[in-house]
Amino acid sequence: METFICRPERGGPFPAVFLLMDAPGIREELRDMARRLGTVGYYVLLPNLYYRAGRDTIFGPDVLEEGSVERDRMRSVRTKMTIPPVMNDVATMLTYVDRQSEIKRGPVGCHGYCMSGPYALAAAARYPDRIAAAASFYGTWLVSDAEESPHLSLSKVKGELYIACAEHDALAPLPMVEELRTLFGRAGTAGEIELYPGVHHGFAFPQRWCYDKPAAERLWERLIALYRRCLG
């Protein structure tokens, strides 16, 4: 599994953080996000979760354009993604971090955007004694009829969760967000669900038409504060 790794140049050991990609896949925009976390003291792993589809899983910039060849190619890979294999990938990364002297022993963080929001929450439930903090940023369909829907395992989470939702998001509509709030409270899960008013799905990515800098910076503030509390 090809993984981009970023860490501070000096000091250490550092807490480990898993950054799980959104549907358009690995690109410089995500690497920059990993670097930003590295500058504040974290050892960041950014895996290419599409690796099972073969080597040709890096898409061109028009992957964001509806009807483009790259977007269709991405969707053909994306639609085959499910939670169980990704949980195996998380297990592989946990094994890796345990073997690195530059990584601080103890809790790990995990956050995901878009399609990986559910993966981050599922990882917190699957590995509750390892993942002390997890975040979903405009995660898609966090409540669904799927057998592996993240809402079904909220009660297994021991760490703290932060779930950020966009007001305008067809992949996480407001009725779903409200249902998730109810289920979140019922499960007694530690953390917060925050609705970002006036923004659209993808608002945290600087290269998107919907980028909203104030909301994106607040997202960074929330994420870093979460990791400071839970990982150090």
Where is each model-derived feature located?
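N-terminal cap/leader regions of alpha/beta-hydrolase-fold enzymes
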Residues: 1-232
